[in-house]
Amino acid sequence: MDTGAYLHSVFGLEGKTILVTGAAGGIGSAISRGLASAGGEVALCGRNLEKCRILADEIAAAGGKASAHHLDVADLDSIQGCVDEVVQQYRKIDVLFNVAGINKREGLLDVAPETYDRIMNTNLKGLFFISQAVAREMYRQKSGNII
């Protein structure tokens, strides 16, 4: 057995539904492509739906399976709407891959309270509440992993 086939048999993701937050960004798109190439069905979730759609088309052209979904992790309604949409389409979520995040390069003395709140709402609060929403689904399924 060749190494690639062996690794795919051990680490393959066939039949697994993976929700990726921040999927259209640089790191998110690379992770999403890798998950799809390992056989996962990837729900590409991000604020820029058009970029998610383009990535889904690129993954499909490479033989993978992906779908695009709008998600703003700083918006609780957006979180629940996205999770509901993914579950409706795939009937399950096996893995949540948290990639969404923002940053603004400013010195400590220059960060405005509004900037700090926006970063924390996305990077901390958003990560917590998308994980909570997906965990509820995973609890119902009696399986799942959050990364």
Identify the function of each model-found stretch:
Residues K16, G64-K65, K92-I93, M138-I147:
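Active-site loop of short-chain dehydrogenase/reductase
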Residues A24-G26, N48:
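Conserved glycine-rich cofactor-binding loop
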Residues V99-K104:
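Conserved NAD(P)H cofactor-binding loop of Rossmann-fold oxidoreductase domains
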